[in-house]
Amino acid sequence: MHQLLSDQIVECGLSDFYEVKQQYIEGKNGSQFSFAGLKHNARQLKSFEGVDICWCEEADAISKHSWDILIPTIRKPESEIWVSYNPQLIEDVTHQRFVVNPPASAKVVKIGWQDNPCFPEVLRGEMEHLKAS
């Protein structure tokens, strides 16, 4: 995710606005993207209090233990947790928590590759090849 955002900052001509560091990306307006792994560092999430938006990418791999730490940490009024992943198993903790039995306040939006206006042609070709084989 860090590399993707860094590349987009350059591609969109925003390098003068954002300062890209190894652990975070900071905007001149005080906005900040912070990056943390959940698998081995779930306890460090407690330092993320005050976050407005927490985006969990590849969230299918997030354990119940990590969710149990993260969810109460993101408690600023009007804060949001965004979850994106490719479902593997219906029994996966993330899928159960946010799709099968979502919180009343959840907004669940199912998105596929066809909804991505930037979906690369090379991936489309690979996908079609895999379907055919």
Name these PLM-found stretches.
Residues 1-133:
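Phosphate/NTP-binding elements of NTP-utilizing enzymes
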